[in-house]
């Protein structure tokens, strides 16, 4: 893979080698003028062929004439003409979409930037002993390589570090992409598909010692659309710092993100996925402003997590909390239909939309300013007290394990339509074998519950709602 000739001004990778950007724009303008003249000529010739009279129609683009046929109603020819017209309209819309993507790609590739150095040059300076690269160069000065569909994804990332995808191109991953260096991928809304039998698509391993730049840290993917149909593996397996910014995942029957290190998902969308973001033991996970829709398990936390300003809809499990987390300003609506179990604490429990696994030493999660509507919540026993603050449990059922009944505090929540249930015992006569989120099948004992809503609900005759539990400092 050769680098573009940076000594010639106006040349970019992916363009013609002997034509500059200005010449390319001029040629495109000329082609548009020729197309307009041809359309006008076609309209005038059609008018002459109709017996000397001008056809009824409307002015089209490039001063041409778009005729409007009048098929006979109630006849087969009229129906056939309508079907052909629909096909023509659909084909026209597809062509317009392709033309728009091509123009967008040309516009992005033709922009002038203050890029002056390649990543290979930084590596050479680093090997020669230059230790001030962090202050010598910036992200804007690093040259961008526009990736073509036929190029090797792994080789391009390890060679150029800063790689941009073309919006008018569909990329296909046919083998595992091993990333062992600092990498930054600008997706520009490009679509990435998978045709591989490997278990991992992008393996973000521990990085070797190399140059550092302000604005580039670890592995970053931005504005990429992953269509994961037919791929049953893991899209991202990371043991280093991974940042996903505005990434779209759809129809992933495996795991979208499996992290053993630090992972940050910001503004991402997960639609119809098996597992969205999974943080393993001793991992640090940050999920902000993401959307989870119709997922089986949106988030699984085994280490530490910060979950803020997210939205979930029709997920079987929005959060399976095995570790510790801070859950604030989230909106969770509805739950999917499933009979999945979880055996995280050694006991088989039915998987709920918000599920806190019991642990004798780990504290309760911080739960503030959340909106739950028509959800189910499972609370396992933990150390300390669980006190949700300024959260709305609208038409939500909360199931508390036996030891967790005395460790919850429901002051400061909106509890009009909330129902609280306590597990009294497990009925051994009602045994069911259900699939578990770990991949195996387990036997689940049916719990016998007791409604304790009025016992734990705040006595509103004794405590006024005009108190600090329902107010904030920024209110008037």
From Swiss-Prot:
Q: Which Pfam families match?
A: Adeno_E1B_55K, Adeno_E1B_55K_N
- Keyword annotations for this protein? Early protein, Host cytoplasm, Host nucleus, Host-virus interaction, Modulation of host cell apoptosis by virus, Phosphoprotein
Output a single Gene Ontology CC term carried by this record. Answer: host cell nucleus
Give the Phosphoserine positions (modified residues): 472-473
Q: Which domain of life is it from?
A: Viruses
Show the GO MF annotations: ubiquitin-like ligase-substrate adaptor activity
Name a single GO biological process.
symbiont-mediated perturbation of host ubiquitin-like protein modification
According to its record, what is known about the domains? Answer: Contains a PML interaction motif that allows the subnuclear PML localization.
Similarity section: Belongs to the adenoviridae E1B 55 kDa protein family.
Functional note: Plays a major role to prevent cellular inhibition of viral genome replication. Assembles an SCF-like E3 ubiquitin ligase complex based on the cellular proteins ELOB, ELOC, CUL5 and RBX1, in cooperation with viral E4orf6. This viral RING-type ligase ubiquitinates cellular substrates and targets them to proteasomal degradation: TP53/p53, LIG4, MRE11-RAD50-NBS1 (MRN) complex, ITGA3, DAXX and BLM. E1B-55K probably acts as the substrate-specific adapter of the SCF-like E3 ubiquitin ligase complex.
What protein name applies here?
A: E1B 55 kDa protein
């Amino acid at each position: 893979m050769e680098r573009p000739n940076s000594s010639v001004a106006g040349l970019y990778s992916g363009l013609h080698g002997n034509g500059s950007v200005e010449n390319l724009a001029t040629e495109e303008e000329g082609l548009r003028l020729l197309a307009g003249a041809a359309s006008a000529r076609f309209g005038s010739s059609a008018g002459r062929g109709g017996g000397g009279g001008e056809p009824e129609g409307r002015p089209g683009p490039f001063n041409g004439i778009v005729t409007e046929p009048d098929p006979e109603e109630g006849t087969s020819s009229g129906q056939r003409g309508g079907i052909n017209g629909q096909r023509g309209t659909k084909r026209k819309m597809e062509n317009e979409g392709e033309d728009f993507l091509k123009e967008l790609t040309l516009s992005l590739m033709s922009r002038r930037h203050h890029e002056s150095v390649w990543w290979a040059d930084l590596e050479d300076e680093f090997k020669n002993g230059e230790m001030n690269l962090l202050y010598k160069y910036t992200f804007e000065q690093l040259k961008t390589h526009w990736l073509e569909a036929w190029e090797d994804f792994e080789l391009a990332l390890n060679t150029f570090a800063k790689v941009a995808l073309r919006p008018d191109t569909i990329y296909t991953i046919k083998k595992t992409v091993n990333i062992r260096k600092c990498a930054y991928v600008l997706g520009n809304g490009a679509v990435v598909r998978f045709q591989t039998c490997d278990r991992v698509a992008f393996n973000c391993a521990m990085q070797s010692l190399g140059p550092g730049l302000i604005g580039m840290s670890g592995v970053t993917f931005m504005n990429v659309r992953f269509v994961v149909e037919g791929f049953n593996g893991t899209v991202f397996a990371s043991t280093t710092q991974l940042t996903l910014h505005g990434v779209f995942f759809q129809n992933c029957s495996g795991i979208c993100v499996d992290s053993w290190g630090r992972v940050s998902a910001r503004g991402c969308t997960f639609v119809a996925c098996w597992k969205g973001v999974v943080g393993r033991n001793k991992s640090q996970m940050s999920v902000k402003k993401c959307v989870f829709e119709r997922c089986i398990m949106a988030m699984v936390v085994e280490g530490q997590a910060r979950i803020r300003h997210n939205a979930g809809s029709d997920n079987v499990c929005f959060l399976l909390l095995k570790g510790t987390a801070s859950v604030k300003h989230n909106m969770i609506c509805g739950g999917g239909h499933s009979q999945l179990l979880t055996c995280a604490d050694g006991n088989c429990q039915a998987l709920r939309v918000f599920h806190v696994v019991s642990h004798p030493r780990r504290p309760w999660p911080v739960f503030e300013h959340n909106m739950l509507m028509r959800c189910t919540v499972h609370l396992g026993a933990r150390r300390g007290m669980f006190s949700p603050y300024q959260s709305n449990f609208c038409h939500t059922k909360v199931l508390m394990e036996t030891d967790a009944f005395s460790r919850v505090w429901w002051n400061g929540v909106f509890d009009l339509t909330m129902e609280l249930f306590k597990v009294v015992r497990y009925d051994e006569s009602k045994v069911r074998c259900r699939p578990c989120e770990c991949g195996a099948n387990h036997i689940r004992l049916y719990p016998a519950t007791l409604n304790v809503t009025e016992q734990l609900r705040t006595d509103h005759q004794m405590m006024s709602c005009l108190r600090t539990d329902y107010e904030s400092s920024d209110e008037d």
